[in-house]
């Protein structure tokens, strides 16, 4: 599947309506758009949150099989009320939609508690680097989340995931991985890297 976002230098932001329409028209594999109104922190004001509600509704009603969100409150905890509202909007429009909580988790307080809150809210997946700069550095927390909490929501390692380390992350018990599949921050997706990653995953 593809996580679709704009604003790559900012860590990903909500793609435009035109890009969403194009994705529906031309992409044959599952596409999960990100809903994030701006770069920076993950605590949003009322106007930003209102735009997120509208974007979640739009994406869910367009027929995308999943989407990606993440909100923290001013204290640095998962914003349970706002996340619950967004999940409710998405699943009212599409009851089977899969919802991933993105790397806002890596800035959250008390990661075990945060993970348990995401499970209670009903998130499908968690994208995380284990609260470290990259997934290999955060492998201890990733492993703990997977093994101690039944991998529900599914823990998806992300952050500098490459063909030469993906096997180590899969060995932790991960059933999903996330990679930009680029050779540098200034280049686009590299098909060869995608192929190598896919081969590693399918070999498990």
Task: Annotate each language-model stretch with its function.
Residues 16, 20, 140-148, 170, ...:
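C-terminal helical cap(s) of enzyme catalytic domains, especially alpha/beta-barrels
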């Amino acid at each position: 599947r593809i996580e679709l976002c704009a604003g790559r230098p900012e860590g990903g932001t909500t793609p435009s309506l035109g890009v969403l329409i194009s994705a529906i028209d031309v992409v044959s594999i599952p596409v999960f758009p990100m809903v994030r109104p701006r770069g920076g922190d993950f605590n949003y004001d009322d106007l930003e949150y209102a735009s997120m509600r509208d974007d979640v509704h739009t994406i869910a009603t367009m027929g995308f099989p999943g989407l990606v969100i993440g909100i923290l409150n001013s204290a640095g905890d998962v914003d349970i009320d706002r996340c619950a509202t967004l999940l409710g909007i998405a699943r009212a429009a599409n009851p089977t939609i899969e919802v991933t909580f993105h790397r806002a988790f890596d800035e959250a307080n008390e990661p075990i508690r945060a993970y348990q809150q995401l499970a209670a809210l009903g998130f499908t997946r968690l994208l995380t680097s284990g609260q470290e700069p990259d997934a290999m550095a955060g492998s201890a927390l990733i492993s703990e989340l997977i093994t101690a909490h039944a991998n529900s929501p599914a823990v998806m390692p992300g952050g500098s995931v490459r063909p030469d380390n993906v096997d180590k992350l899969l060995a932790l018990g991960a059933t999903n991985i996330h990679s930009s599949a680029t050779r540098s921050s200034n280049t686009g997706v590299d098909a060869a890297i995608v192929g190598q990653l896919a081969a590693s995953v399918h070999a498990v």
